[in-house]
């Protein structure tokens, strides 16, 4: 997936912002990270997103996907080989990560995401 398409999809989610941080692009919903693109210049070197422990087991069984460094164990994965997840599947995982993070926000803030 191309960088511009990945950024556009993530930014299409409600109240999403992006900052350059930790050598990549960090996407946040109301200041809570839900997705990260790691970069070498303009080249994607991986993506990181949140998942449930059950999803973690399913995802890390695939080659090219492992525990995201510096993130909660069994809750965040890093995809190094984007070919492992086709574009629709990656978009679904990004959306799922957004939903998991948004679910932890206050009810008042959650109402602004609809």
Language-model segment annotations:
Residues 1-114:
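Charge-dense, helix-prone N-terminal extensions
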